[in-house]
Curated annotation (Swiss-Prot):
The record marks 137, 351 as: Interaction with tRNA. InterPro entries: MnmA-like (IPR004506), MnmA-like_C (IPR046885), MnmA-like_central (IPR046884), MnmA-like_central_sf (IPR023382), Rossmann-like_a/b/a_fold (IPR014729). GO terms for molecular function: ATP binding; tRNA binding; tRNA-uridine 2-sulfurtransferase activity. Residues 159-161 are annotated as: Interaction with tRNA. Disulfide bonds join 112-209. This is tRNA-specific 2-thiouridylase MnmA. Its main location: cytoplasm. Catalyzes the 2-thiolation of uridine at the wobble position (U34) of tRNA, leading to the formation of s(2)U34. One of its GO terms (biological process) is tRNA wobble position uridine thiolation. Belongs to the MnmA/TRMU family. Keywords: ATP-binding, Cytoplasm, Disulfide bond, Nucleotide-binding, RNA-binding, Transferase, tRNA processing, tRNA-binding. GO terms for cellular component: cytoplasm. The gene is mnmA. Its EC number is 2.8.1.13.
Length: 385
């Protein structure tokens, strides 16, 4: 087996590298080229990059396409740019807007990986005769003894991106490779300099790529003018406390920007899109113990329907560490349910809940799903309050 767990020697193995124009994917292309693989670089143009060409912290924009092409020239590998704007708009941006209108807090990077990068790009790699698609994500995969691959948290905990990749299917995972999963970020930048790549000191992408300076509400309002429908801000008992200019300006757990005069700090507890109401309450009302998941993607052994009550660790936000929980299967509703052993604040519908085998820094990713606003979620908040 070669370094990618593939049977042929590197010079007989074609690998497509998804090149975003950043340092991570550029280093992946450089490392594989240096090892002798037949490397082909592909960059996706995902949105109208005119306004974002010179914006720092974005990805897949005009500057990034230029950088990816320059890296490919330095490495001496073929490079293709594909226009995926229409697919990205339909699969990611439109869904992002609809999710916010429904009172949810979506994670567009998860949907982009699931619906665009790992579906369409993987198919393209196969069409190009590649035996693997490699990316610059910080996540690890290892061969299973029985076949296929398993997903694990990255070596560098500060860079671990497993939260955003839980929706990778077993079939996709078998074809994908993540060469940076066992490397720290500092080593990646050092390798970029060693390889002579101009992007060695380029800043990492931070924002949602199609949202300038984090102003997601402006993007949604432009796509869906009805999103700015005003409404009431009420307390847990339904008493009117103030007004707002659209629920898209709020998310569960938010405190700033409420502009309310109250004797205690108030937080957004839930959003009611049907009535255009923002419900606020004390911090205790944010505590959630039970979560129901839809769109479950299962990467563990067996079928999710066979889960009785399994101890796991879950992450409900990308910035939080996995916490102990119990996972079970609700046969009546055909969905997974998670019971948090310690209540979590600010759990929002639309976010991802990622399931790990345990809370070890290198734990296996068992899968995950989308958190939905249902009775069980609100009941958990009420119990904690």
């Amino acid at each position: 087996m070669n370094s990618l767990d593939l049977p042929k020697p590197p010079h007989e193995t074609r690998v497509v590298v998804a090149m975003s124009g950043g340092v991570d994917s550029s280093v992946v292309a450089g490392l594989l080229k240096r090892e002798g693989y037949d490397v082909v670089g592909v960059t996706l143009q995902l949105y109208d990059h005119g306004a974002a060409t010179h914006r720092k912290g974005a990805c897949c924009a005009g500057r990034d396409i230029h950088d990816a092409r320059a890296v490919a020239e330095t490495l001496g590998i073929p490079h293709y740019v594909l226009d995926y704007e229409d697919r990205f708009r339909e699969s990611v941006i439109d869904r992002f807007a609809e999710s916010y209108l429904s009172g949810e807090t979506p994670i567009p990077c998860v949907e982009c990986n699931r619906s665009v990068k790992f579906r369409d790009l993987l198919g393209l790699a196969r069409d190009l005769g590649a035996e693997a698609l490699a990316t610059g994500h910080y996540v690890a995969s290892r061969a299973r003894p029985e076949g296929g691959r398993a997903l694990y948290r990255a070596l560098d905990p500060a860079r671990d991106q497993s939260y955003f990749l839980y929706a990778t299917t077993p079939e996709q995972l078998a074809y994908l490779r993540f060469p940076l999963g066992e490397r720290p970020k500092d080593e990646t930048r050092a390798l970029a300099r060693e390889l002579g790549l101009a992007v060695a000191d380029k800043a990492d992408s931070q924002d949602i790529c199609f949202v300038p300076q984090g102003g997601y509400a402006d993007v949604i309002a432009k796509l869906r003018p009805e999103a700015t429908r005003p409404g009431e801000i009420v307390d847990l008992d339904g008493r009117r406390l103030g007004e707002h200019e659209g629920i898209i300006h709020y998310t569960v757990g938010q405190r700033r920007g409420l502009k309310l005069s109250a004797g205690e700090p108030l937080y957004v507890v839930r959003l009611e899109p049907e009535t255009a109401r923002v419900v606020v309450g004390p911090r205790a009302a944010l505590a959630t113990r039970r979560i129901r998941l839809t769109d479950l993607n299962w990467l563990g052994d067996g079928a999710p329907e066979d889960i009785a009550e399994r101890p796991v660790a879950v992450r409900v936000r990308s910035t939080r560490e996995p916490r102990p929980a119990r996972l079970s299967w609700n046969a009546a509703e055909a969905c997974a349910e998670v019971e948090l052993l310690v209540p979590e604040d600010g759990v929002s519908p639309g976010q991802a809940c990622v399931i790990y085998a345990d809370d070890d820094p290198r734990a296996q990713v068992l899968g995950g799903g989308t958190i939905r606003r249902i009775g069980a979620l609100q009941a958990g908040a009420a119990e904690a309050a």
